[in-house]
């Protein structure tokens, strides 16, 4: 969390973040702080929110490849996707090469630290 607080203060964001654990309040608080730091004026044109296990990884990749509209980056928040239990190889491979104009923020209850997604996120975020 120290690194995350530093990123929020400096405005130098990594391409991907993972917030996980049982503490729903803290996850929501950090999610909101990151969103506000990336979009200080409240503009949500470059903000996308996905929730649940039926998320299509290809759709996330397409959105991340889309250039942000009059902003430095696009924020894509993915909550409770299950990607860190049942990894999406396509998304895990993409995270390793994703552009600096996109930022994935994963908010999960659990994350398998042995999984491909966790390792990909750890290498980039």
Task: Give the role of each language-model region.
Residues 1-3, 10, 14-17, 24-28, ...:
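Non-catalytic interfacial helical region
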